């Protein structure tokens, strides 16, 4: 399905004057992943922002629920002149990026042959390539805003596929795989939970740096050619991972910026709405979203 065809589904968004049009983007291996596109108006050409959360799975059901329950961020982006889309992609494969290497596509018997299956960040690549063909989207101004694992996806995407986005925001990026983090038993409150990211105590940046493969992380970051804003959360147990991700970007001479706020909610830049589309948003959440939009405004300005 081409993005200028009729969408697969049209979702009403509580509290919004704009519907969400669900399209299916063909993945690199010939399957399909959904995204729910909203544009500020029916006419015009707009910069576009991918919205992503977590480590995948759930398909259309997850996507439809997310569109309805997390419309505050989309309304803010639409009001600022951005098209945007909640997206869903395949489930993360543990250490798939680290061990899988670059995706190589060959040919056998007149058909494609791959050295591995595409990964979740390559589903985002497929979505970006698909939406770039939409008549309402400015293909030269694509961006990413992702939280948690979807923050790490930005690093993976920008490292493996330079130039796909103009800019990106990684919020509380769970970059343990990208940084090749090797935690020790002492990094967990309960040593029996070793290996579970949710149980790691990685608030201190120097502690994280000592446990990362810094040379490999820098090598991966050397390919990143787009501005990235990293947003942390002051008291998060993984704040050291978030901060080190920024520091290594800056040390690699990348265009990197850092911000962090004190907030009790993981993923606080994506406030949840009730059934009427009303969100209980506090000043900290609005300040963080303001900073994201300001970053996008700066880096997605029309090309001269």
Spell out what each predicted region is.
Residues 255-304:
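C-terminal catalytic histidine-bearing segment of alpha/beta-hydrolase fold enzymes
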Residues 126-186:
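Primarily recognizes the serine-hydrolase "nucleophile elbow" in alpha/beta-hydrolase
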Residues 166-220:
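Mobile cap/lid helix-loop segments that gate and shape the active-site cleft of serine hydrolases
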Residues 44-46, 54-94, 238:
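Short substrate-entry loop that stabilizes the transition state in hydrolases
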Residues 102-135:
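Alpha/beta-hydrolase active-site loop
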Residues 237-243:
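Conserved alpha/beta-hydrolase "acid-adjacent" motif
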Residues 2-43:
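N-terminal cap/lid segment of alpha/beta-hydrolase-fold proteins
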Residues 224, 230-232:
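Short beta-strand/loop motif that positions the catalytic acidic residue
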């Amino acid at each position: 399905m081409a993005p200028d065809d009729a969408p697969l589904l049209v979702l009403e968004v509580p509290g919004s004057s704009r519907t969400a049009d669900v399209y299916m983007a063909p993945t690199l291996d010939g399957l399909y992943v959904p995204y729910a596109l909203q544009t500020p108006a029916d006419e015009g050409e707009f910069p576009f922002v991918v919205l992503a959360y977590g480590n995948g799975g759930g398909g259309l059901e997850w996507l439809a629920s997310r569109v309805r329950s997390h419309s505050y961020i989309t309304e803010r982006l639409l009001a600022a002149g951005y098209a945007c889309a909640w997206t869903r992609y395949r489930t993360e494969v543990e250490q798939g990026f680290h061990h899988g290497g670059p995706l190589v596509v060959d040919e056998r018997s007149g058909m494609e042959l791959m050295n591995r299956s595409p990964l979740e960040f390559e589903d985002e690549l497929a979505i970006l390539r698909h939406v770039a063909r939409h008549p309402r989207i400015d293909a030269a101004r694509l961006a990413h805003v992702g939280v948690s694992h979807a923050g790490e996806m930005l690093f993976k995407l920008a490292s493996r596929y330079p130039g796909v986005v103009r800019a990106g925001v990684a919020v509380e990026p769970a970059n343990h795989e990208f940084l090749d983090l090797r935690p020790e038993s002492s990094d967990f409150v309960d040593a029996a939970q070793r290996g579970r990211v949710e149980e790691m105590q990685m608030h201190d940046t120097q502690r994280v740096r000592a446990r990362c493969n810094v040379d490999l992380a820098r090598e991966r970051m050397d390919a990143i050619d787009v501005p990235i804003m990293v947003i942390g959360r002051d008291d998060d147990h993984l704040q050291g991972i978030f901060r080190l991700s920024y520091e290594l970007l800056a040390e690699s001479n990348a265009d990197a910026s850092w911000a962090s706020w004190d907030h009790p909610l993981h993923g606080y830049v994506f406030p949840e709405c009730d059934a009427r589309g009303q969100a209980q948003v506090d000043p900290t959440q609005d300040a963080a979203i303001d900073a994201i939009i300001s970053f996008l405004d700066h880096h997605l300005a029309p090309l001269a």
